[in-house]
Regions:
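Basic amphipathic alpha-helical segments that dock to polyanions
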Residues: 67-77
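Short, small-residue-biased leader/transition segments that mark boundaries at the very start
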Residues: 1-6
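Non-DNA-binding regulatory cores of transcription-related proteins
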Residues: 76-158
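DNA-recognition alpha helix
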Residues: 46-59
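Short capping segments at the starts of secondary-structure elements
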Residues: 29, 41-46
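Short alpha-helical segments that sit at the start of domains
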Residues: 8-35
Length: 158
């Protein structure tokens, strides 16, 4: 499910604490606030979205640079996944996040998540030589219905 339960929030805090200790990073309240905010966002987000969330919550004034550097830290700690959709970087929480795939519209750039049991099974049954898979993500590129419709309308108007 997409709702984060309290137990998961505690767990990710614990993962962060261990990561910071092992790597000799400071345990700043900002880092925990950013983590908490990220884990309250459903689906994908970019730095601007995260920045606005943080600003609106008013807990911490965090610069975009700080957010960016913190996210790099979280990716290394396996708490955040980075996606490169065309030229925009999008992020999402990694812990306890069910495997899902992405449909990406090449016209408007909209990213839609979807799950598919058949795909899941097919990938699970795929034999990988000398390789142990930990996770995966599938990107399917195409044109969304909104853009398809807009294109059709343009053709008619000519």
């Amino acid at each position: 499910g997409s709702e984060m339960c309290i137990r998961d929030r505690d767990k990710v805090k614990q993962i962060l604490t261990e990561y910071l200790q092992v790597n000799g990073h400071r345990k700043t309240p900002e880092r925990y606030a950013i983590l908490d905010t990220i884990y309250s966002i459903k689906g994908h987000f970019d730095i601007d979205t995260l920045y606005n969330y943080m600003a609106n919550e008013g807990k911490f004034r965090v610069s975009r640079a700080t957010l960016y550097n913190t996210i790099i830290l979280f990716i290394d700690a396996k708490l955040v996944i980075k996606h490169q959709f065309g030229n925009s970087s999008q992020y999402e929480r990694a812990y306890n996040n069910e495997t899902h795939h992405h449909m990406i519209c090449t016209e408007c750039g909209k990213v839609t998540e979807f799950q598919d049991e058949n795909l899941k099974q097919a990938i699970a049954n795929t034999k990988l030589k000398k390789f142990h898979a930990s996770h995966y993500s599938l990107y399917i590129y195409g044109v969304c219905s909104k853009c398809t419709w807009a294109k059709r309308r343009k053709k008619k108007d000519k």
